[in-house]
Swiss-Prot record:
Protein name (Swiss-Prot/TrEMBL): Glycerol-3-phosphate dehydrogenase [NAD(P)+]
Residues annotated as signal peptide: none
Alphabetical keyword list: Cytoplasm, Lipid biosynthesis, Lipid metabolism, NAD, NADP, Nucleotide-binding, Oxidoreductase, Phospholipid biosynthesis, Phospholipid metabolism
Gene it is expressed from: gpsA
Record field: catalytic activity: sn-glycerol 3-phosphate + NAD(+) = dihydroxyacetone phosphate + NADH + H(+); sn-glycerol 3-phosphate + NADP(+) = dihydroxyacetone phosphate + NADPH + H(+)
InterPro entries: 6-PGluconate_DH-like_C_sf (IPR008927), 6PGD_dom2 (IPR013328), G3P_DH_NAD-dep (IPR006168), G3P_DH_NAD-dep_C (IPR006109), G3P_DH_NAD-dep_N (IPR011128), NAD(P)-bd_dom_sf (IPR036291)
Family the UniProt entry places it in: Belongs to the NAD-dependent glycerol-3-phosphate dehydrogenase family.
Binding site for sn-glycerol 3-phosphate: K106, G137, S139, K192, D245, S255, R256, N257
Organism per entry: Bacillus cereus (strain ATCC 14579 / DSM 31 / CCUG 7414 / JCM 2152 / NBRC 15305 / NCIMB 9373 / NCTC 2599 / NRRL B-3711)
Compartment list: Cytoplasm
Gene Ontology CC, one term: cytosol
Length: 340
């Protein structure tokens, strides 16, 4: 039995805490809303972020991070990307022994364009890190909460660490594969949010299945192109954390990014969309970070660039579609060498 603290009590953190508790681990969960932590402890429910799901009574919730981290040997980080450094800076003052740091967040840090594992390694002293592991894949919290069949990937530089996390989570409804390509796994999970926003826009505009299929396919090309330039394995982007996550995020009403894009396509402003969502839409921040990365690394990402102009430069969504359709003619095979 592993003592593990889930840091972040949103929908995904809560669902993963449930998986770990189902597997018999000593599970604590921390959140910054005391009333929500009280509800988890007394009613065994997170009505704000995962309504209708009864949680295992063995999950203990804390609003004090210091109390939540007592004697743990593993932490699972599931907080918004913009909050990572603040949370990690608080945690490094509490943790005294080397532990395993797992993260299940899909985004790139705003401002630095760093992957989350890089942020962890920057903020946490080396003597407090046993391993850094990423858990990612096509996985809506709502379906995991219902214990519906889900498959994800555990990635780490040290394969033994990825396998240890695989053992922590794997059960009859939650299957875990391993992958040594931590760069590719993180980038696939983060960058697909951009394409999901764009897919929502195409649906909001009523452009049809042909346009959406093209968008997803060309979107995967962009993800692989930047991922390869940053050191990821091209095959990773054809797997669960690339194509798999892209499909589920672009086609499901559970997807916050798709829902946000759908509202944009129907004429709502970005401010209206974010206010109505009530939860973090990582794709918005990731679009900005990826656009900056693409320019810095001289990687062509036309869908990302078009979406960036819509989100941050006030470009009209219909004009963005026109700009993509009117691009210079290309050979498809020449455009996707990283996938061959």
């Amino acid at each position: 039995m592993t003592k593990i603290t889930v840091v972040g009590a949103g929908s995904w953190g809560t669902a993963l805490a449930m998986v770990l508790a189902d597997n018999g681990h000593d599970v604590r969960i921390w959140g910054n809303r005391p009333e929500l932590m009280d509800e988890i402890n007394t009613k065994h429910e997170n009505s704000r972020y995962l309504p209708g799901i009864t949680l295992p009574s063995t999950i203990v919730a804390y609003s004090s991070l210091e109390e939540a981290l007592v004697d743990v040997n593993t932490v699972l980080l599931v907080v918004p990307t913009k909050a990572y450094r603040d949370v990690l800076q608080e945690m490094k003052e509490i943790v005294t022994e080397p532990i395993t740091w797992i993260h299940a967040s899909k985004g790139i840090e705003p401002g630095t364009s760093k992957r989350i594992s890089e942020v962890i390694e920057e903020e946490i002293p080396e003597h407090l890190i046993k391993d850094v592991v990423v858990l990612s894949g096509p996985s809506h919290a709502e379906e995991v909460g219902l214990r519906q069949a889900t498959t994800v990937t555990s990635a780490a530089k040290r394969m033994e660490a990825a396998e240890e996390v695989q053992d922590l989570f794997m059960n009859s409804y939650f299957r875990v594969y391993t992958n040594p390509d931590i760069v590719g796994v993180e980038l696939g999970g983060a960058l697909k949010n951009i394409i999901a926003l764009a897919a929502g826009i195409t649906d909001g505009l009523g452009l049809g299945d042909n346009a959406k299929a093209a968008l997803m396919t060309r979107g995967l090309t962009e993800i692989a192109r930047l991922g390869r330039k940053m050191g990821g394995n091209p095959l990773t982007f054809a797997g669960l954390t690339g194509m798999g996550d892209l499909i589920v995020t672009c086609t499901s009403v559970h997807s916050r990014n798709w829902r946000a894009g759908n509202m944009l396509g129907k004429g709502h402003s970005l401010e209206e969309v974010l206010e109505s969502m009530g939860m973090v839409v990582e794709g918005v921040r990731t679009t900005k970070a990826a656009h900056e990365l693409a320019e810095k690394m001289e990687v062509e990402m036309p869908i990302t660039a078009a979406l960036y102009d819509v989100l941050f430069n006030g470009n009209n969504v219909k004009d963005a579609v026109g700009s993509l359709m009117g691009r210079v003619r290309k050979h498809e095979v020449e455009a996707i060498p990283d996938l061959l």
